[in-house]
Amino acid sequence: MKVAVVGATGMVGQVMLRVLEERNLPITELIPVASERSVGNKVKFKDKEFTIVSMDDAIAVKPEIAIFSAGGNTSLEFAPKFAEVGTVVIDNSSAWRMDPTKKLVVPEINANVLTKEDKIIANPNCSTIQLVMVLHPLNIKYDIKRVVVSTYQSVTGTGKAAVDQLNSEIKGENPEKVYPYQIFKNALPHCDVFSDDDYTKEEIKLMKEPKKIMGDDTFNLTATAVRVPVQGGHSESVNIEFENEFDLEEVRNILSETPGVTLQDDVKNNHYPMPLYSEGKDDVFVGRIRRDLSQPKTLNLWIVADNLRKGAATNAVQIAEYLVANNLV
């Protein structure tokens, strides 16, 4: 099977190649794609070197699957061109997520919605993925009424230039800024651009995407997204109000038995999720599970995941694996 990785030199693209190496997708030909300035350069994959090609050359090869991590404008322009030659596109950008004709997929939750007719499949936002991995099983059991989420997001979510800014500031240098302010020793309540209603695009994604993935628009959700000077992964403080009463031990049991979720909830031994220890892992980690003492039927918890892996690359590869396993490609 021929697989194109579009945006192969970016942070997510590099992790994508690593995840593809680790997993069992039956790749016979890898087609790395990047910007024109990178064409002709090499990337390593399974101890071999592959030459980066242009978008047009990749389309001409007619790969079975193309995984995009190259930004929304690139996806809007080129994903349909791949689809025209029969390629299934799995897109990491926000370009197609809320398009009513496109599926927004977290495989553990809703891969069953995919069909052979789906030629452009949207990969959700990184912070959305880890959130719905926890919300979905609890919604099935207790029926969610309202969610309040505050995020603490890694600079890796912005890209390599943001990581370089943080590392330079740690050294006491004065680098070119990706963010409007210093990120070292700071926290910026400003993930992505602000919309007319004063929410950021990141917050709007968090408020809209879960409902589409979970197939449930009956609950309300509000979000505040904050960029923090860490590199390991994204963290989320989540407050969930349910329609039905819950039992804390049952909540822990449900989450511990949810595929792709690891329970870390032993505060007596200082055992709880942290972004530093999520780095390089594919699971979503959940802990600090406790009742909200201010109102009934309400739960507080803390969710952490590697935003480059389950939040992006791993989820996309899992979609590809599902397509192959179910003869949808």
How would you name each of these model-derived features?
Residues 66, 155-329:
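Charged docking surfaces used in two-component/phosphorelay signaling
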Residues 1-183, 218-220, 284-285, 289-295, ...:
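N-terminal Rossmann-like NAD(P) cofactor-binding subdomain of oxidoreductases
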